[in-house]
């Protein structure tokens, strides 16, 4: 077999220009990833911690085997959308190891609009479920969500890959005997309550976790008039 020799000249001006351009792109990517990893604004993160809660990435670190890798899925989902109000689409998804077994982890980020679902949050959740279905990965849901982001509910529900498909996928996984375990870690309403309700096992954190179809303000018809 013929050997393909490189003709790149690392001392040429063109090489230096291309290298500088690529390094700038890599630096920009790393900056975007770092910003998305922070989650919501500082005020929201401090309020979350003041309630005695772990930040979502700390929850994942505590769950996974010490020192094991975490393959994150779509960390830049919703980047540049919604006036950058939903970093990472408000949910962390990825594959990690629990007792040496690969699992799909989905963790709502309550520091981002109370963990509510923007349209891209739904798409990211669905993509993670597709990966779990295709690879028969057990799912661990770290739930801390107020359900759909109501100001954008007209974009959350109307298409084929809408909010309701999350629960359809859960039913399909249940039928396929793919384990689903949920931990309710905050005030979870509407869609945030359905996910743990449709899981095989659910753990509710004492003095933190609650489930409800909706809150009193949403149930008050006067709020909609």
What do the PLM-derived regions correspond to, one by one?
Residues 1-99:
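N-terminal amphipathic, basic-rich helices that act as targeting or association modules
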Residues 85-130, 134-135:
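Glycine-rich active-site/cofactor-binding loop and its immediate structural neighborhood
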Residues 143-225:
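Conserved catalytic cores of soluble enzyme domains
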